[in-house]
Structure formats: C-alpha cells, structure tokens
C-alpha cells in the first residue's frame, strides 16, 4: 500500500470535513436502480486504462476543474467521484463543491474498495 505524506493526508482530512462520502455498496445500489448520476474517475490516464468502474467517465484530477462544466453543465447533477483509495477524490469533491456543484460524493474507499466488495471493473 502506498504511504502518503503527512501534508497530503492533512489536506485530505480537511476536505473530508466538508464533503459527503459514499460506500461502494450504496454506489452499486444507485447504479443498479438506474438512478441518474455521473460517475467520474479522477485517476491518471494510465490508471484509467488499467480498469475502471463500468459507466464511469474519465476526468483526471489535473483537468477536472477545467473540463467539468463541459461534461456536466447542470450543477444539480448527482456526481460521484473516485480515485484509487479515496484520497484524491475527496480533494476533487471539495473542489467541485467550491465550483457550485451541490450533489457531489466521494467514493470512500476508491476503486480498491469497489474491487474488494466484489464488484466488476471494465478494462
């Protein structure tokens, strides 16, 4: 498991105070019920290429603020963001809320939690 630096963990913890998180199980329920949502993978290009949650779109953490309004113009859209382990996506969720998106959730355990729960990924 990757060891994160104390300063990175500090800013993630700060972001997590302001955001809502969602578990893999609740995300799967929402997807199975066909609830309208936008699932966004915020990992790097090479991570996306190695596999992602079916139905997700890819907007890496480095470009999401620049491109989100083109991909998701309605700020009321239910958005769920994920990364590998739930850290980077917390930062992204906080940023999207600052941009006026009102229904943003971070996948608490990231893609690894999705896989650990036994759910499929698309390669």
Where are these regions (language model features)?
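Rhodanese-like catalytic fold shared by cysteine-dependent sulfurtransferases
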Residues: 1-38, 45-78, 84-123
């Amino acid at each position: 498991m990757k060891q994160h630096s104390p300063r990175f963990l500090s800013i993630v913890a700060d972001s997590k105070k302001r955001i809502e998180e969602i578990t893999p199980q609740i995300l799967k329920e929402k997807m199975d019920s066909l609830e309208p949502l936008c699932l966004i993978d915020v990992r790097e290009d090479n991570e996306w290429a190695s596999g992602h949650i079916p139905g997700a779109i890819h907007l890496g953490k480095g470009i999401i603020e620049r491109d989100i309004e083109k991909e998701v113009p309605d700020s009321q859209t239910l958005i769920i963001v994920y990364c590998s382990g739930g850290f980077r996506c917390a930062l992204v969720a906080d940023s999207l809320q600052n941009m006026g998106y009102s229904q943003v959730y971070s996948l608490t355990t990231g893609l690894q939690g999705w896989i650990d729960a036994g759910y499929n990924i698309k390669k």
